[in-house]
Amino acid sequence: MFKKSMLLSIQSVLALLVILAASLMPTWAAEQEPSVAWEKIDRGVMLIDVRTAEEFAEGHIDGAMNIPFNNIVPELAKLNITKNTEIVLYCRSGNRSDMAQKSLVKQGYSNTYNAGGFNSLISAR
């Protein structure tokens, strides 16, 4: 009897841990869908190109502002961007926008989307 109730308790705790872990999955795990990104961009959300100034000058999405990924947190703070502002980030491949997004989420920004790479976005348009 004791073994059975102990086993049931362990199973319950494990099930609770799985549910908790699933709810804490990063928001960027299923992102980088160009169609979703374009829907957001077309709605006029804040669009940030996190590539270098040189890459930005070579071409960018209309309406995007350029903030290199390693400056994203202090620059948004300087601009007084609220932490619930809807923000779409992109770079060349999706890696730097992922790093920028993680930095923003860590600082409490709750409405960010990693749109992935510039070329993928342009080809999907």
Where on the chain are the PLM-derived regions?
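Rhodanese-like catalytic fold shared by cysteine-dependent sulfurtransferases
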Residues: 2-45, 54-86, 95-125
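Structural scaffold elements adjacent to functional motifs in cytosolic proteins
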Residues: 48-49
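Short, surface-exposed ligand- or partner-binding patches at beta-edge/loop junctions that are enriched
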Residues: 90
